[in-house]
């Protein structure tokens, strides 16, 4: 399979990032290698983005089919363009991956599933999306910008209680100065509201009493993004929901970009691979007594030095795979 995927990749790499280089897929060949596409396979790409992973998967088998899902309508439109030539082999769904299988009736069990978590290059590079700290961007950060029920970053920063802000930066940004930062934000908004990424970065300057590093800024923006989009809750629910629809022998490949995501994936895959899940105090096994599946590779797969050199945003990526029994 590896040679087949490598050769298919060479043929399709040019268009894998989508129109306007929407997003360069990370760990592309490695992910499809572990999925092991089959001719009659039925797959889920729960974060289709620019369509890179789905495109290579479809190129690796003549008749396999994919459900291409994304909560970002802009991403879905790009994926439709990239994957247009595959016709009815692709079904496009605008939804979150933790909800799609409840909304989209399956014809049968999934042969495999892919999740590529995190923010796409397109989302980072578009000022109006508000995900980046590098430009004077509006503080939005909603993955689905059409969903008016989602709170924006501007609303959280200007309306959330100080204690809630502290918790957000501590739990989701792992920021040791979360209390001081929350207090600074509340003090600032009493005078003028925080409306742009520059406004937030200016508060970081005052809090740290120096120029914050890009890594420090990224942690704070990450914390807000996770909160707004319920990313960790979505991941926990989505992993379990997708597992339930995997067929025997199906592979589940998940690419994470920070430790909070990776812990959840690692813990879930490990739990599903245990032969006994009874509480330690139980004298006799009272559960199913059989592992749901296995982790074919205990350590996460990192991008090669060459991939990182060509795509710096791949640096923090880690691929984990679970295979259903």
Indicate where each model-derived feature is located:
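S-adenosyl-L-methionine-dependent methyltransferase catalytic core, i.e., the SAM/SAH-binding region
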Residues: 1-325
